[in-house]
Amino acid sequence: MTNIRKTHPLMKIVNSAFIDLPAPSNISSWWNFGSLLGICLILQILTGLFLAMHYTADTTTAFSSVTHICRDVNYGWIIRYMHANGASMFFICLFMHVGRGLYYGSYTYTETWNIGVILLFATMATAFMGYVLPWGQMSFWGATVITNLLSAIPYIGTSLVEWIWGGFSVDKATLTRFFAFHFIFPFIIAALAMVHLLFLHETGSNNPTGISSDADKIPFHPYYTIKDILGALLLILALMILVLFSPDLLGDPDNYTPANPLNTPPHIKPEWYFLFAYAILRSIPNKLGGVLALVLSILILVLMPLLHTSKQRSMMFRPISQCLFWILVADLLTLTWIGGQPVEHPYIIIGQLASIMYFLLILVLMPMASTIENNLLKW
């Protein structure tokens, strides 16, 4: 008799995706982040659901309701901090996942890659809207500053901002709609993630060498299921250390002050995972130019398949490209640091140089290095 997992309409989909899936035998721990992102998403949906049961999306009670969750709801504090720090873990996994894709040339699977970029944008939008919900000082002013950027769009900008706000400033209407969007977006992300997997399973996974692994495949279960479980345990360990020992390490103290439209905080800054893009935005003196640079800093990922000039897929055997890749990582860390600093000398010039380096590395230096490497190999 044929196994039910191979005949049942639902089970055979699960089977072909997670059990009998032929996977390359040499994929390293860098391939764990896909499953970790799935776990992060499930964790965020579950903790978010329980938070939504006690949260009120109204300017007069939002801040108090978050305080109530932390003080009066059974284990509310741990749910709240798991959700807040879960977002940080989500972005750590996202950056690692994208970095892996860049290093090993996974972007040559263009459909999978482009859905991934859309997923990144959707996750960033969700995180931004979630940050507004506690209605602290940084929530309010962050929402004001970031939504105001849309006013840089010629002709329709101002109308667009007022339409998003639902009035003439960030107020009750804004908070209510942000809560509605923040609730629905993770489910859209989950649907997109399934499409992401669907496209991936059309081609199969890449591997560290970037060479076809058709000749050497192993079943996903038990080899990679056990490996993913190990990754998940390490992720949960890291998250719980953060939640239980220093839950406010990555947060902003200003968010423990209720939102006050009459009092601007001295340094308005987003959560740490947006600081690199925020630094690029601030490094351009022109408003529209800054907004374009901000969007392009992420949208540039779409161009990666077009900028691939090497005759090898992976960077595994390309030392010059490897060197530039790690310079890019260092540059992004520099931008992250600058994004959290006040707008004054020497931070302004460092931010501008790091922003120029970011675009220069991706658009010019890395494609040039690939061409040089091709010639060195006499291809």
Curated annotation (Swiss-Prot):
Cofactor annotation remark? Binds 2 heme b groups non-covalently.
What InterPro entries would the database entry show? Cyt_b/b6_C, Cyt_b/b6_C_sf, Cyt_b/b6_N, Cytb/b6-like_sf, Cytochrome_b, Cytochrome_b_C_euk/bac, Cytochrome_b_N_euk/bac, Di-haem_cyt_TM
Instruction: Give GO terms: molecular function aspect only.
Output: metal ion binding; ubiquinol-cytochrome-c reductase activity
Pfam families associated with the record? Cytochrom_B_C (PF00032), Cytochrome_B (PF00033)
Ligand binding (a ubiquinone): H201
User: In what way does this protein cross or attach to the membrane?
Assistant: Multi-pass membrane protein
Q: Which CDD domains match?
A: cytochrome_b_C, Cytochrome_b_N
The listed locations are: Mitochondrion inner membrane
GO annotation, cellular component aspect: mitochondrial inner membrane; respiratory chain complex III
Q: Which residues bind heme b b566?
A: H97, H196
Signal peptide limits: none
Q: Does the keyword Cytoplasm apply?
A: no
An example GO BP is: mitochondrial electron transport, ubiquinol to cytochrome c
Subunit details for this protein?
Answer: The cytochrome bc1 complex contains 11 subunits: 3 respiratory subunits (MT-CYB, CYC1 and UQCRFS1), 2 core proteins (UQCRC1 and UQCRC2) and 6 low-molecular weight proteins (UQCRH/QCR6, UQCRB/QCR7, UQCRQ/QCR8, UQCR10/QCR9, UQCR11/QCR10 and a cleavage product of UQCRFS1). This cytochrome bc1 complex then forms a dimer.
- Misc note: Heme 1 (or BL or b562) is low-potential and absorbs at about 562 nm, and heme 2 (or BH or b566) is high-potential and absorbs at about 566 nm.
- What is known about what this protein does? Component of the ubiquinol-cytochrome c reductase complex (complex III or cytochrome b-c1 complex) that is part of the mitochondrial respiratory chain. The b-c1 complex mediates electron transfer from ubiquinol to cytochrome c. Contributes to the generation of a proton gradient across the mitochondrial membrane that is then used for ATP synthesis.
Q: Which PANTHER family match?
A: CYTOCHROME B (PTHR19271:SF16)
Q: What is this protein called?
A: Cytochrome b
Q: Record the organism.
A: Cephalophus jentinki (Jentink's duiker)
Tell me the lineage of the source organism: Eukaryota, Metazoa, Chordata, Craniata, Vertebrata
